[in-house]
């Protein structure tokens, strides 16, 4: 049995190749033990684990977890709330003795179009898992936009990651988004931290409810349209909790079908 572990914004998700799956909130995952994987099948039957952890920004190749420095991240501080659940899961897997590998994020050290490297980070590793799934339907050239608490979009062309827009540089999600002038002023004045500004830049904090989904749809569509400049014929896929609600509007904005 093989298991994949996704370190998401709000939860950690666990899935096995037998079709079983479960998730834990990041808070609940602070109490994780390897025995929790019994929900997927006998622990002694696990032949290998692939996991994502945080930004994955200090390595560029799929790597055994016991070979990583600092769990594969430059620092656990940065854009997003640190809770400790993902750290606990990573450490429990590493200490279990079960063969395990980690998926890297996409960042300045990655082999992407150099023009995307104006920003230090492009996408966290779990988005590569989404892209892999999309490739089974759309082939080797496509754009995928993952829309939920934040919005991250990436371009795959001829089976290669060309680049991505991370959560803190372009389209907002429900909770997170880019820092605008007002946020920068508050940070400079010491009213909030930059991380607090990022985690409260989403539409739920700044717009009436009736405008929230249309706003995310427009900005996510703009991310997809921007990436289309580099691959005009790329198909477009949506992922994340908001995808079903926004698909029709995004398709209308782009004037092309999305899946």
Locate the predicted segments by residue.
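Alpha-helical scaffold segments in soluble metabolic enzymes
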Residues: 88, 92, 129-137, 183-187, ...
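Hydrophobic beta-strand segments of well-ordered beta-sheets in folded domains
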Residues: 44-52, 100, 233-239
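Nucleotide/phosphate-binding catalytic cleft detector across ATP-hydrolyzing
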Residues: 1-4, 9, 30-31, 53-141, ...
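Gly/Thr-rich phosphate-binding beta-strand-loop-beta motif of the actin/hexokinase/Hsp70
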Residues: 1-22, 139-164
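A glycine- and small-aliphatic-rich helix-loop capping segment at beta-alpha/alpha-beta transitions
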Residues: 19, 64-71, 157-163, 167, ...
């Amino acid at each position: 049995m093989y298991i994949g572990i996704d370190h998401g914004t709000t939860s950690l998700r666990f899935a096995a190749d037998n079709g079983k799956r479960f998730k834990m909130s990041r808070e609940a995952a602070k109490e994780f033990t390897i025995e929790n994987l019994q929900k997927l099948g006998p622990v002694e039957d696990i032949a290998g684990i692939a996991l994502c952890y945080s930004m994955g920004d200090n390595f560029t190749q799929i790597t055994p977890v016991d070979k990583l420095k600092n769990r594969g991240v430059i620092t656990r501080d940065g854009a997003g709330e640190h809770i400790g659940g993902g750290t606990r899961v990573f450490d429990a897997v590493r200490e279990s003795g079960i063969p395990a590998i980690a998926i890297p994020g996409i960042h300045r050290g990655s082999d992407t179009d150099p023009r995307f490297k104006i920003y230090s980070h492009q996408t966290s590793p779990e988005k590569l898992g989404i892209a892999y799934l999309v490739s089974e339907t759309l082939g080797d050239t496509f754009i995928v936009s993952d829309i939920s608490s934040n919005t991250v979009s990436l371009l795959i062309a001829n089976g290669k990651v060309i680049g991505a827009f991370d959560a803190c540089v372009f389209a907002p999600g429900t909770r997170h988004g880019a820092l605008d002038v007002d946020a920068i002023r508050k940070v400079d004045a010491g009213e909030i931290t930059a991380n607090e500004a990022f985690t409260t830049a989403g539409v739920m904090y700044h717009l009436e409810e009736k405008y929230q989904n249309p706003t995310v749809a427009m900005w996510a569509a703009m991310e997809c349209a921007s990436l289309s400049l580099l691959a005009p014929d790329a198909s477009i896929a949506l992922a994340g909790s908001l995808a079903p609600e926004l698909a029709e509007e995004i398709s209308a904005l782009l004037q092309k079908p999305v899946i």
